[in-house]
Amino acid sequence: MKTTLASLKKGQKATITDFNIDAIPLKLLEMGCLPGNIVELLQVAPLGDPIYITVNDSHVAIRRETAIEIDVELLQEFLL
C-alpha cells in the first residue's frame, strides 16, 4: 500500500521514497524534500490544509495537494 506525506498523523516520521517532480515546488527540493530524507508531520491546520512538516532541520508549511504527491515509508517505530 502506497503511503503519502498527506496521510501521516501528527508526530509520525517517515522516509521520502518518491515524488512527482512536476508537482513539487523547487523551493521544497532545495530545502531537502528529497528521496531518502526523513520527514515529520508536526501540525495540521484546523481545516486540514496546510500541513506543517520538518525536513532536513527546516520547518515548512505545505499544501495538502502537494503532500499527496510525496510518497513516504513510515519509520519502523511508527508501524503497527
Predicted features and spans:
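Compact, glycine-rich, soluble single-domain proteins
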Residues: 1-80
